[in-house]
Amino acid sequence: ALRGASAPETKLTQYYETDIGETRVLTLADNSKISLDAKTAVDVDYTPQLRLIELRHGQAFFDVAKDPTRPFRVTAGGKTVVALGTAFNVELVNDEVFVTLVEGKVAVTDAGDRNEKVVPGVDKADLPPDVRELTPGQRLVADASGASSVEPRADISKITAWRRGKLNFEDEPLGLAIERMNRYSRISLVAGDEKVAALGVSGVFDTGDTEAFVEALQVYFGVRAERRADGSIIIHAPA
């Protein structure tokens, strides 16, 4: 169930999380909205000066109410996304951060950077050199080390398909696809080895339909599915 409570770090921060297979929409004090994917947790900390969100794990879509005097900051992994009024998707999976801009502008900087000049739309001469500014349709991908790259033409419909109860994979590494599928089902999938985790998976699946996903892997790749007593399924390379 969705829970909202004071986080242990500070009484000012509200903590929300969704369970496996559960999605919810939060409406914040300024009418900004956060759509939480399954198995997702966020901290929400609003102050008179800033709107601060930490994505602890999972995925969320942010529809930010405009407030030029109060930047909206979302920290995930090693990155912070700064917005004034916009819509964007942020995902944290396997220590990688994915930021997809749907409309407006955002600036992406290293987590913990509270430089007040780091806001979208300012003169680029005022921005630190490591700040990336995104335009609609772009996706930033940052690895565990913080190194990032920008995809200039991301497929917004595919990336946000989770909001419609679908997962749309296009040559997705199986390891990442498994992490995403596991948000929606208590049948936990595990890649048997790195070679299996690197397989490129394509297709559209209903969220939570783990059996159909495993069946597709068996048909197209000939993998072996080992079913454990605890309900998990280990995906092994073809025999």
Locations of regions flagged by a protein language model:
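A residue-level detector for the "anchor" residue at the start of short, highly conserved motifs
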Residues: A1-A239
